[in-house]
Design a protein with these regions (language model features):
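Short, acidic, small-residue-rich periplasmic hinge/interaction motif at the N-terminus
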Residues: 29-41, 47-53, 61, 92-96, ...
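A beta-strand signature from Gram-negative outer-membrane beta-barrel systems
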Residues: 109-112, 164-166, 229-269, 344-346, ...
Length: 771
């Protein structure tokens, strides 16, 4: 499908390389051997101070890039030569954030530097294509510096982002360790497609989709749990103008950069943590006396008389003639039976170092988090290796490799009235016991059966139910960069993702309410499931940078991304094993066994172009365009462009920013930064199903004969959802960047939204998927 397209793109990229090299070559031949520019040498003086202490910083570097530089003395003072008093100076010092200072006509300046890792507009922001100071960005983007997140070692990233970034809603799924949160960036954009932001880790797409529902009720396998937050250096959230990611950028993007060596000297970090998780306060529920009154009223509404109700064993308070008195005259706190306080332990080791040829960062970690629900916990083993290589002055490379293994003991969650212990603890009659008791009031070690209302025993589900989730992922990439000339660079990244999820579940018959199947009543329930994902990803781009007269900066990029993904789900469910000691699927009745699953294979190609222009580091323009092809798109799509019989979505964007604080009329202002932003973009959502546009079939058995039947009605005109976004924003910082303010006004409109349209019953199906 993409062979011809790839060949054509390679030819186009080759032509661009040739033209750029020829341009540089011609420029070198026609230019004088030595540039001579008449520059008036002016001098700027000042002091560089620590923002916290006010003391001068020794050894700070003050420079006008490619022109002059100076180092501060013992008092933090400096002198630097500049051609005009309207330049931008760069101030760097070890252990501090880099700061860009516009002179705006001033001859003397005082600069206060904040410690490294402070979240401000001077920090480098990782955009989809490069890293640049936040002050120079044209889009609605936010950045947080985690730098290992040492203070919150057991959080998953999606939970850690809660309340950190404006416009990003992080809603926790539950209190189960590692289950994480649902992320929504500026609300919902689709009814049936995904609303998850695209996640990028070290330049490669990190798949956070779920390929098959869990067999453990209302549980979710969270890919973010496989990223140790102590391995994360910073996170950038791209809220708009994500068209550079084409049909995957409709919901914005979260760009994660993991930690790497910042210096060649060997550095060892070790952390060990123990956290106490306190049992939450119990929700107010009825006690035994109140529940009897409530139950009597409920039975009366069902038609029972007062005499019949008073004859029930739970209403008779006399032990004489009531052998079940001790069974029904208790005051059990069911919430205490299923919940407890717990401990969490976390151990982390990282070693960084290197030399002129290569630097590395190697980390290993182990974490054990016990849940507040009894018998639930999570064990995580993780390792990560990041390295950077200098093969030559022109040829460099990088490696980012990680492997994480996760084990969880779980229980059913949510409103599951038969098997969820938390729900049952809130609804179970408090006058009952969790254990069997005889007519003398002697309690047995055996757990009690279901009650007269057929309610399950929460203690049985805590102690005798089995629900395991084992999950691992390998995520790795290699990147190479070659400087073709002073202005022209070529780079390529290649990586793979491989993960596997295995689940096992057993629900005993004793003490648990029976389930009803289509052909039987199920007492014990057994199940196993395996989900696999394999994906390979590549991103190759050419980049051209040119600065003219120091004030005009031009950057352009042309690139090609390709991703192939293959997912599979297989499950088996069994019922009614002979005893509760037989817990695997093969021990269930053959006639009741259920098997199923699914497979999915899809390709994605993204051809992208980017052009940027900056004038005096105060006016910034950016234009992006992407052409996206996908095996998911139909053959009769009406929009986009067609290349070699394949339909491509064309998604452009444009953005502009004006840094008013760099203008001369704000030379005496107390405001450190004041920036206006405008952006417009078109983005796509390709979550329309792998085979929705095609005619598919499924096997079916009839009277012992196997055959094929239609699995749905194809929609060959089905295409991507298109989101049009407009954003206007302002960024302000004051008090030496200690106070920052960002406000955005945005409007989003989704076209060609995925919907299920009702059709006549004569087609054999009730709905069809359309735009």
């Amino acid at each position: 499908m993409y062979a011809t397209i790839t060949s054509g793109v390679r030819k186009a990229l080759g032509l661009v390389v040739l033209l750029a090299v020829l341009q540089d070559s011609t420029a070198q031949q026609t230019a004088p051997k030595k540039d001579t520019v008449a520059v008036t040498k002016l001098q700027v003086t000042g002091t560089i101070r620590d923002a916290a202490t006010g003391k001068g910083i020794v050894g700070a570097r003050v420079s006008l890039p490619n022109v002059s530089a100076s180092i501060t003395d013992a008092s933090g003072s400096f002198k630097v030569t500049v051609p005009t008093y309207f330049e931008d100076l760069m101030v760097t010092a070890e252990g501090y954030d880099t700061k860009q200072i516009p002179l705006k006509g001033r001859k003397t300046i005082e600069v206060s530097l904040l410690e490294e890792g402070y979240n401000g507009f001077q920090d480098p922001l990782t955009s989809p294509l490069a890293t640049a100071p936040s002050r120079n960005t044209t889009t609605a983007s936010s950045r947080i510096q985690l730098d290992g997140a040492w203070t919150r070692p057991m959080e998953t990233l999606d939970g850690l982002l809660q309340g950190q970034i404006a416009g990003l809603n992080s809603t926790r799924r539950s209190g189960t360790p590692g289950v994480g949160a649902n992320l929504f960036l500026r609300g919902y954009n689709s009814l049936y497609g995904t609303n998850k932001p695209l996640v990028i880790v070290d330049g490669m797409i990190y798949d956070v989709n779920d390929y098959g529902q869990s067999i453990i009720a209302n549980n979710y396998t969270n890919p973010f749990a496989l990223i140790n937050v102590q391995d994360i250096d910073n996170v950038t959230v791209l809220k708009d103008a994500a068209s550079i990611y084409g049909a995957k950028g409709a919901n914005g993007a979260i760009i994660i950069t993991t930690s790497r060596a910042k210096q060649q000297a060997t550095h060892i970090d070790f952390g060990a943590y123990t956290t106490y998780n306190q049992q939450p306060s119990n929700l107010p529920v009825m006690n035994a006396a109140d529940y009897r009154i409530y139950l009597a009223g409920m039975l009366q509404s069902k038609g029972m008389t007062s005499t019949q109700i008073n004859a029930m064993p739970f209403m008779i308070d006399d032990t004489t003639g009531n052998p079940e008195y001790y069974r029904y005259h208790n005051n059990t706190n069911w919430q205490d039976k299923i919940m407890k306080s717990s401990l969490t332990n976390n151990y982390f080791l990282r070693v960084t170092g290197g030399d002129n040829i290569a630097t590395y960062a190697l980390s290993v970690g182990y974490a054990k988090a016990q849940g507040i629900i009894r018998a639930t916990d999570m064990n995580r083993y993780n390792t990560r290796f990041n390295a950077a290589f200098n093969f030559s002055k022109r040829f460099t490379g990088a490696a980012n490799l990680s492997f994480t293994y996760n084990e969880q003991n779980l229980r059913d969650q949510g409103i599951s009235d038969k098997t969820a212990p938390v729900f049952l603890a809130l609804t179970k009659a408090p006058f009952l016991l969790d254990r069997e008791v005889n007519d003398k009031g002697i309690t047995s070690p055996n757990y009690a059966e279901t009650d007269f209302l057929n309610k399950s025993n929460p203690a049985v589900l805590i102690n005798n139910m089995q629900a395991f989730n084992k999950y691992y992922r390998f995520f790795g990439s290699f990147k190479f960069n070659y400087a073709i000339s002073k202005s022209f660079n070529a780079s390529t990244l290649f990586g793979i993702t491989y993960d596997k999820v295995r689940e096992n579940i057993f629900i005993p018959r004793k003490g648990v309410q029976d389930d009803t199947l289509s052909n039987a009543v199920a007492d014990s329930r057994l199940g196993t499931q395996v989900k696999r994902l394999f994906s390979y990803y590549s991103d190759t781009k050419l980049e051209y940078n040119k600065t003219v007269n120091r004030y005009h900066q031009f950057t352009s990029r042309l690139g090609l991304r390709y991703q192939h993904s293959d997912a599979e789900q297989d499950y088996a469910l069994g019922f009614n094993s002979a005893t509760d000691d037989l817990v695997s699927v093969q021990n269930g009745l053959n006639a009741l066994r259920q098997i199923g699953g699914g497979i999915g294979e899809w390709n994605w190609m993204n051809i992208y172009f980017n052009a940027e222009y900056a004038f005096k580091n105060k006016l910034f323009f950016a234009v992006n365009a992407a052409a996206d092809g996908s095996s998911r798109f139909g053959k009769e799509v009406k929009n986009g462009v067609q290349i070699n019989g394949n339909h491509f979505a064309v998604l452009p964007s444009a953005s502009f920013a004006w840094l008013l604080s760099s203008e001369n009329f704000m030379a005496d202002s107390k405001i450190d930064l004041f920036k206006l932003r405008l952006s417009w973009s078109m983005t796509g959502n390709d979550d329309i199903g792998n085979y929705t546009t095609r005619q598919t079939y499924t096997s079916q058995n009839l009277l012992g004969m196997q055959g094929l039947v239609r699995n749905g009605i194809p929609t060959p005109a089905l295409q991507w959802e298109t989101g049009e976004k407009f954003n206007a924003g302002v960024d302000v910082s004051a008090l030496n960047d200690r106070l920052t303010f960002t406000a955005d006004l945005f409007h989003t409109k989704t076209r060609n939204m995925l919907v299920y349209e009702n059709i006549t019953g004569g087609a054999g199906f009730n709905t069809i998927v359309t735009n």
